Amino acid sequence: MVKFSIEKKTILGRLGKIDSWGPVDVNHATPSCMTYLRAGHIPHLTWDVAENQLKLSQTPIYQMTLPSLISNAKIIEKFGKGVAKFVGMGALESPAIHLSPFDPLGKLPSGYNDSKSIAIWTANGKVSLDVKTYRNTVNSFGCGSFETLVDYDLPRDAGHKKLLKAVDRTTTFNEQIFKQDEKIDGERIVALGGGFSKYHRRKCAVDIGLAENTAAYTVEFHEFVEGMETDEMEMKELLEETFSPLPPTKLRCISGPFNPKTVLFLVQQGIDLFDSSFAIKLAEEGHAFCLADDYPTSSKYEVVDFKDQEKFADDFTPVFDGCGCYTCTKYTKGYLQHLLNTKELLASILLVIHNMSEYDRMFKLIRKSLENSEGL
């Protein structure tokens, strides 16, 4: 089970703790984030580097993303020992793993879902994922939890007919995957959709969110990630409509590369668990970020582009003063810029280590702020 408890409610958000994730004891405080994996690894890091140089503040909950592994699904099933051992996580001590059918950094083009399947996008193109295939994949991967299928194809201009069809599809997928005569392993994290419509957000929540044995909820919000829709009032209203008919004690998750400002806002709306894809996205763009000294009192943060040759070529100061991560204690701005411009693999490794460390520190600061806030 996903054993979650709310320890404190404030106007700034919910302070909670995840005691177990599936069969694994984690003792993981929230708000926090899952550790985003691509092809079963933190992008650009080997497991040896991750264990020795990436010092996270809590026992990780790993987000295993399906698009990078779906082509190996039959091989993993034949392998018979689960996805963790297949991708080399066997050396980790009882990792807590969540299976997501989508990659938060992947594309989700419109127009490819149908009544029998959801389109996911891999390096080789579109794969249509139906319920039977997904159930078999969930069972063979052996993760502690899995996310249910949701029809995400609801752009802002979607009409009532399209919205209703998408919600009905999501409901049907849920009914089919949990058929009584079909076995499925792992805790269910119910994915809630509905696009930009408050009515359909609530309808989806009522139709599938009240089912028994629901371990947690995740909100489909890919239209609101950085660079796309960011209307905070609209986000607030959609989340209120989604969660108001649901049990308030369940864990609430969201997936996507949300920046520190948006994370702080979503925490205030009651979201408990995010993912670390924002840190990876920045690193793959040659960027590093640093929170303002007064975060989260203010939501400010700085993003530095280390591809800027003129600015950093002769700068031999630490990457970020005061940061205790491996990157900032061992390397300089000038050297990092040199690595990026010569396309050295070490550049991405160092940026991922720093950004992951800073994203982890961000949640630690948010939790400390909630601890010091007046309870409701």
Curated annotation (Swiss-Prot):
Keywords: Cytoplasm, Metal-binding, tRNA processing, Zinc
Gene Ontology MF, one: metal ion binding
GO cellular component labels: cytoplasm
Subunit relationships: Heterodimer of a catalytic subunit and an accessory subunit.
Single GO biological process annotation from the record: tRNA-guanine transglycosylation
Statement: the UniProt record of this protein carries the keyword tRNA processing: yes
Function, in words: Non-catalytic subunit of the queuine tRNA-ribosyltransferase (TGT) that catalyzes the base-exchange of a guanine (G) residue with queuine (Q) at position 34 (anticodon wobble position) in tRNAs with GU(N) anticodons (tRNA-Asp, -Asn, -His and -Tyr), resulting in the hypermodified nucleoside queuosine (7-(((4,5-cis-dihydroxy-2-cyclopenten-1-yl)amino)methyl)-7-deazaguanosine).
Primary site of residence: cytoplasm
Name of the featured protein: Queuine tRNA-ribosyltransferase accessory subunit 2
Cofactor note as given: Binds 1 zinc ion per subunit.
InterPro entries, per the entry: QTRTD1, Queuine_tRNA-ribosyltrfase, TGT-like_sf, tRNA_ribo_trans-like
Compartments where located: Cytoplasm
Similarity comment: Belongs to the queuine tRNA-ribosyltransferase family. QTRT2 subfamily.
Binding annotation for Zn(2+): C323, C325, C328, H354
Cofactors required: Zn(2+)
